[in-house]
Amino acid sequence: ITANYTGGDIGVFLLDAAGKLQAEIQYIAFEGRTPERVAHVHCMIPTPDGKYVLATDLGNDHIYRFRYNQEAPQGSVVLTDQQIAYQVSDGQGPRHLIFSKDGRFAYLINELGGECVVLSYHKGKIKEVQRLMADEGQGGGSADIHISPDGRFLYTSHRLKKDGISIFAIDPKRGTLKKVGYQLTGIHPRNFAITPNGKYLLVACRDDNKIQVFQRNATTGTLTDTSQYISVDKPTCIIFAK
């Protein structure tokens, strides 16, 4: 399932046994709320129970929910029952969404407004629990969001002003966040990834042409610049293979 930002649409493709893309079996186009506000679908993510798929629409300030039909015959429609699951505050621009390790909470980073929103999740329904400012520079360029492998800390990246990573401790019972630090990075940290062992956090600094390596303190969640980096032309995404 792909989110297409510029077109404001979703594509669903079949995969063969080797994981190669096959035919597109479903196409869903979104309309803008007004002629000036066009749809920009930025992220698609399945819910932990596997029953739904959520989509963030940065242009319309919506999170949409689709029912996912796992039993659909091969080649038939799999996403149905489109609904607005959460209305984001106007102008916030929802970008990326991630679920907690236990699946009870979702965390949203808003690109334009710079807020991080904590949402509870239960049987296809999401409700707002907490909102707090994550972008210290308030540059309108918040980008990525990830949770540490142990589920104790959440990180968000921010561009355009005071480029860096916000660090939050996660309350294990309530899912709420507490700010514990902010780590400056190279220019335009569009994306980042935490190593599977949780020891390092790698930042794709697009306009510095490098992947910056930070050591992560498992106890405090804070980051330390190792002064090591990997030279890459305009890096935009880091994913660890499983």
Functional labels for PLM-detected ranges:
Residues T2-Y5, A55-L58, S100, L108-L112, ...:
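Conserved beta-strand positions in repeat-built beta-propeller and related beta-rich domains
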Residues I1-I45:
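Asp-box/WD-like beta-propeller blade repeats and closely related beta-sheet repeat scaffolds
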Residues E31-G50, Q87-F105, D135-D150, T185-Y200, ...:
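Beta-rich, blade/repeat-based domains predominating
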Residues F13-Q22, R67-V77, L119-I126, F168-G175, ...:
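Short loop/turn segments immediately following beta-strands, especially the blade-tip
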Residues G140-R174, K178-R206:
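Loop/turn-rich, solvent-exposed surfaces of beta-rich toroidal or solenoidal domains
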Residues R206-Q215, T224-K242:
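Blade-level signature of beta-propeller repeat domains, shared across WD40, Kelch, NHL, RCC1
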Residues Q22-F30, G75-Y86, K127-A134, L177-L184, ...:
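Beta-propeller fold detector
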Residues Y52-G113:
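Loop-centered beta-sheet repeat module
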